[in-house]
């Protein structure tokens, strides 16, 4: 694609088989905070790729594992499927679902699998065993928090606008002959 930097081309080449996969594309239909899961994992993946490349770690595994870390196809806030975890257990259970989905469609190496399993650490108790897994875990928390607070700020601004008294809202222009600049000259 024209106009992209070389590292962006490399990132897309590394992850193309995942982000273009039909089953993975279904993540576009499920909400994260104020974006789709697809957009969220793309952001986490790219952030992790850049960090690991800078640190001279396995940036390919980081990018691929990060892309698959939330590969679950349900709305965790609102579903009635008995086999899926209740909202309060989603944080602990969804890595297991993501790993099962990832293994069904892709071949994973040890780092990628560790990234998916441990990205919710410390909630999942067992710490990551690879530096790349730590980076993805922190990138996920940072970007999910940013999404949440951006949404919160956006909603808070809307509430404040609704509460603003009429005296503080902008007035419509009125036809005051003493303030009009394009009026006819007095005779």
Residue ranges and their predicted role:
Residues 1-187:
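Metal-dependent phosphohydrolase cores
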């Amino acid at each position: 694609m024209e106009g992209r930097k070389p590292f962006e081309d490399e990132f897309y080449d590394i992850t193309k088989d995942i982000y273009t996969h039909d089953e993975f594309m279904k993540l576009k239909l499920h909400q994260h905070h104020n974006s789709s899961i697809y957009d969220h994992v793309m952001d986490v993946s790219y952030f992790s790729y850049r960090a690991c490349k800078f640190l001279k770690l396995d940036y390919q595994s980081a990018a691929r594992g990060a892309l698959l870390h939330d590969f679950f196809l349900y709305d965790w806030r609102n579903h009635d499927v008995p086999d899926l975890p209740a909202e309060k257990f989603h944080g602990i259970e969804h890595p297991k679902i993501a790993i099962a989905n990832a293994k069904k469609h892709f071949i994973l190496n040890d780092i990628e699998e560790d990234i998916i399993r441990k990205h919710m650490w410390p909630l999942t108790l067992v710490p990551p065993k690879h530096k790349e897994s730590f980076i993805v875990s922190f990138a996920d928390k940072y970007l999910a928090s940013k999404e949440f607070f951006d949404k919160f700020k956006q909603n808070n601004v809307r509430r404040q606008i609704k509460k603003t008294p009429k005296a503080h809202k902008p007035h419509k222009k009125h036809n005051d002959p003493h303030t009009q600049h394009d009026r006819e000259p007095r005779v």
